[in-house]
């Protein structure tokens, strides 16, 4: 069997940034078109080459294909997003680290400080939103391409992944339980698979894009 090449830093960075956007705000009409585009299909095909991600990618591909069968797909996705991530009842999957007892309070602020980052004033959500963790991981993977800070950024990447994995499995399980159509459930499963896959790489500072 031919071994597939590992994902490189820039690919991780782009995938994390894409996922951050999808978990931060509702999919609008333009976003729906992009989800169903050849560009996203190519990205998913790239991820699918990794055996650890193949099943999660295949499930998300099925859910994206199913969107074409839903009347008013954009409005229904928006309703799914609102019900899962903006409500506070027991049938939601709130994307905030502080909602999960496993997470040390204020961890994301320490991680951002170490990375020399801060939350933009225009960001109206709490700083421990899932999207902030993913944007941080995206930034760290891009920074790994700069040789003078590889060691420090890789160590911070590992700390961020470990912190995220304290509560991401429960978040994913909540998405599975409460997403009736399954798009965000599939998206969260792919995210969890990617984070676990990334966490399994001890030192990504040696993996460089050609």
Curated annotation (Swiss-Prot):
It is found in: Cytoplasm. SUPFAM superfamilies: TorD-like (SSF89155). GO terms for cellular component: cytoplasm. It comes from the Bacteria. Pfam families: Nitrate_red_del. Its main location: cytoplasm. Keywords: Chaperone, Cytoplasm. Belongs to the TorD/DmsD family. TorD subfamily. Involved in the biogenesis of TorA. Acts on TorA before the insertion of the molybdenum cofactor and, as a result, probably favors a conformation of the apoenzyme that is competent for acquiring the cofactor. This is Chaperone protein TorD. It comes from Salmonella paratyphi B (strain ATCC BAA-1250 / SPB7).
